[in-house]
Curated annotation (Swiss-Prot):
It is a single-pass membrane protein. One of its GO terms (cellular component) is membrane. Partially overlaps IZH1. Its main location: membrane. It comes from Saccharomyces cerevisiae (strain ATCC 204508 / S288c) (Baker's yeast). The chain crosses the membrane at residues 11-31. It is found in: Membrane. It comes from the Eukaryota. The keyword Transmembrane helix applies. Keywords: Membrane, Transmembrane, Transmembrane helix. This is Putative uncharacterized protein YDR491C.
Length: 163
Protein backbone atom coordinates (compact mmCIF):
# COMPACT_ATOMS: atom_id res chain seq x y z
CA UNK A 1 0.00 0.00 0.00
CA UNK A 2 2.79 2.40 0.87
CA UNK A 3 4.53 1.49 -2.37
CA UNK A 4 1.40 2.50 -4.28
CA UNK A 5 1.24 5.88 -2.50
CA UNK A 6 4.96 6.46 -3.18
CA UNK A 7 4.44 5.55 -6.86
CA UNK A 8 1.46 7.92 -7.05
CA UNK A 9 3.49 10.79 -5.55
CA UNK A 10 6.39 10.09 -7.93
CA UNK A 11 4.04 10.07 -10.92
CA UNK A 12 2.37 13.32 -9.81
CA UNK A 13 5.76 15.02 -9.41
CA UNK A 14 6.85 13.66 -12.80
CA UNK A 15 3.64 14.92 -14.47
CA UNK A 16 4.05 18.29 -12.77
CA UNK A 17 7.64 18.46 -14.08
CA UNK A 18 6.48 17.55 -17.61
CA UNK A 19 3.75 20.23 -17.48
CA UNK A 20 6.26 22.85 -16.28
CA UNK A 21 8.68 21.90 -19.08
CA UNK A 22 5.89 22.08 -21.67
CA UNK A 23 4.82 25.50 -20.39
CA UNK A 24 8.46 26.65 -20.52
CA UNK A 25 8.83 25.55 -24.16
CA UNK A 26 5.47 27.09 -25.05
CA UNK A 27 6.56 30.42 -23.55
CA UNK A 28 9.91 30.14 -25.31
CA UNK A 29 8.14 29.54 -28.62
CA UNK A 30 5.83 32.52 -28.03
CA UNK A 31 8.79 34.75 -27.19
CA UNK A 32 10.63 33.61 -30.33
CA UNK A 33 7.58 34.39 -32.47
CA UNK A 34 7.23 37.77 -30.77
CA UNK A 35 10.91 38.53 -31.38
CA UNK A 36 10.53 37.62 -35.08
CA UNK A 37 7.46 39.82 -35.35
CA UNK A 38 9.24 42.75 -33.68
CA UNK A 39 12.32 42.27 -35.87
CA UNK A 40 10.15 42.17 -38.99
CA UNK A 41 8.31 45.32 -37.91
CA UNK A 42 11.57 47.14 -37.09
CA UNK A 43 13.05 46.15 -40.46
CA UNK A 44 9.95 47.46 -42.22
CA UNK A 45 10.12 50.74 -40.27
CA UNK A 46 13.84 51.05 -41.05
CA UNK A 47 13.21 50.50 -44.76
CA UNK A 48 10.44 53.11 -44.73
CA UNK A 49 12.79 55.55 -42.98
CA UNK A 50 15.48 54.90 -45.60
CA UNK A 51 13.00 55.58 -48.39
CA UNK A 52 11.93 58.81 -46.65
CA UNK A 53 15.57 59.84 -46.28
CA UNK A 54 16.26 59.12 -49.95
CA UNK A 55 13.24 61.17 -50.97
CA UNK A 56 14.42 64.01 -48.72
CA UNK A 57 17.93 63.78 -50.22
CA UNK A 58 16.45 63.90 -53.73
CA UNK A 59 14.36 66.98 -52.90
CA UNK A 60 17.32 68.73 -51.29
CA UNK A 61 19.61 67.81 -54.19
CA UNK A 62 17.09 69.20 -56.68
CA UNK A 63 16.85 72.38 -54.63
CA UNK A 64 20.65 72.62 -54.46
CA UNK A 65 20.93 72.09 -58.20
CA UNK A 66 18.48 74.95 -58.70
CA UNK A 67 20.37 77.16 -56.27
CA UNK A 68 23.80 76.39 -57.65
CA UNK A 69 22.67 76.96 -61.21
CA UNK A 70 24.46 80.06 -62.39
CA UNK A 71 23.35 81.87 -65.51
CA UNK A 72 26.31 83.65 -67.05
CA UNK A 73 26.15 87.15 -68.40
CA UNK A 74 28.87 86.83 -71.04
CA UNK A 75 27.51 87.94 -74.39
CA UNK A 76 30.17 86.10 -76.39
CA UNK A 77 29.18 82.72 -74.93
CA UNK A 78 26.85 80.52 -77.03
CA UNK A 79 23.22 80.49 -75.92
CA UNK A 80 23.13 76.79 -74.97
CA UNK A 81 26.11 77.29 -72.65
CA UNK A 82 24.84 80.61 -71.38
CA UNK A 83 21.57 79.40 -69.90
CA UNK A 84 21.73 77.59 -66.60
CA UNK A 85 25.13 75.94 -66.53
CA UNK A 86 25.63 74.20 -63.19
CA UNK A 87 28.71 75.48 -61.45
CA UNK A 88 30.54 72.41 -60.13
CA UNK A 89 33.24 74.24 -58.20
CA UNK A 90 31.38 74.26 -54.91
CA UNK A 91 33.85 74.08 -52.03
CA UNK A 92 34.12 70.71 -50.32
CA UNK A 93 33.45 72.25 -46.91
CA UNK A 94 30.16 73.71 -48.18
CA UNK A 95 29.12 70.37 -49.63
CA UNK A 96 29.98 68.60 -46.36
CA UNK A 97 27.99 71.23 -44.47
CA UNK A 98 24.97 70.69 -46.73
CA UNK A 99 25.15 66.90 -46.29
CA UNK A 100 25.49 67.34 -42.53
CA UNK A 101 22.39 69.55 -42.50
CA UNK A 102 20.39 66.93 -44.36
CA UNK A 103 21.65 64.18 -42.04
CA UNK A 104 20.99 66.23 -38.90
CA UNK A 105 17.46 67.03 -40.03
CA UNK A 106 16.52 63.40 -39.64
CA UNK A 107 17.94 63.17 -36.15
CA UNK A 108 17.52 66.50 -34.41
CA UNK A 109 15.73 69.04 -36.56
CA UNK A 110 12.59 69.37 -38.56
CA UNK A 111 12.91 69.16 -42.34
CA UNK A 112 11.92 72.82 -42.66
CA UNK A 113 14.84 73.99 -40.52
CA UNK A 114 17.20 71.67 -42.37
CA UNK A 115 16.10 73.10 -45.72
CA UNK A 116 16.81 76.61 -44.45
CA UNK A 117 20.34 75.63 -43.37
CA UNK A 118 20.88 73.80 -46.66
CA UNK A 119 19.70 76.84 -48.55
CA UNK A 120 22.15 79.08 -46.68
CA UNK A 121 24.99 76.65 -47.42
CA UNK A 122 24.04 76.57 -51.09
CA UNK A 123 23.98 80.36 -51.26
CA UNK A 124 27.44 80.48 -49.70
CA UNK A 125 28.64 77.98 -52.31
CA UNK A 126 27.09 79.92 -55.17
CA UNK A 127 28.56 83.19 -53.90
CA UNK A 128 31.98 81.54 -53.63
CA UNK A 129 31.76 80.30 -57.23
CA UNK A 130 30.77 83.72 -58.57
CA UNK A 131 33.59 85.46 -56.70
CA UNK A 132 36.05 82.85 -58.01
CA UNK A 133 34.75 83.45 -61.56
CA UNK A 134 35.18 87.20 -61.22
CA UNK A 135 38.69 86.88 -59.80
CA UNK A 136 39.72 84.38 -62.45
CA UNK A 137 38.43 86.60 -65.25
CA UNK A 138 40.02 89.63 -63.54
CA UNK A 139 36.72 91.49 -63.72
CA UNK A 140 35.93 94.13 -61.14
CA UNK A 141 33.44 93.03 -58.51
CA UNK A 142 30.95 95.81 -59.12
CA UNK A 143 27.62 96.11 -57.35
CA UNK A 144 28.47 93.34 -54.89
CA UNK A 145 26.29 94.97 -52.21
CA UNK A 146 23.24 95.20 -54.49
CA UNK A 147 23.75 91.64 -55.70
CA UNK A 148 24.05 90.45 -52.11
CA UNK A 149 20.81 92.21 -51.14
CA UNK A 150 19.00 90.77 -54.16
CA UNK A 151 20.31 87.32 -53.30
CA UNK A 152 19.13 87.71 -49.71
CA UNK A 153 15.64 88.58 -50.89
CA UNK A 154 15.73 85.51 -53.18
CA UNK A 155 16.86 83.46 -50.20
CA UNK A 156 13.99 84.77 -48.09
CA UNK A 157 11.43 84.13 -50.84
CA UNK A 158 12.68 80.59 -51.41
CA UNK A 159 12.71 79.90 -47.66
CA UNK A 160 9.10 81.03 -47.36
CA UNK A 161 8.18 78.90 -50.37
CA UNK A 162 9.82 75.82 -48.83
CA UNK A 163 8.35 76.48 -45.40
Amino acid sequence: MEALVALQQTLSWFLLLVVVILIFFLLLSCLTQLRRLITKRMTKMENNRKVRNQNHFCKVNIALAELLTVSTDDTDMPLEKKSNSINRRVPTCTYIYMCACVYMSDIYMSNRLSKVFTLIAASIGREYCQIADALQAKKPLKNRWENGLARLSDLRAWTLKVA
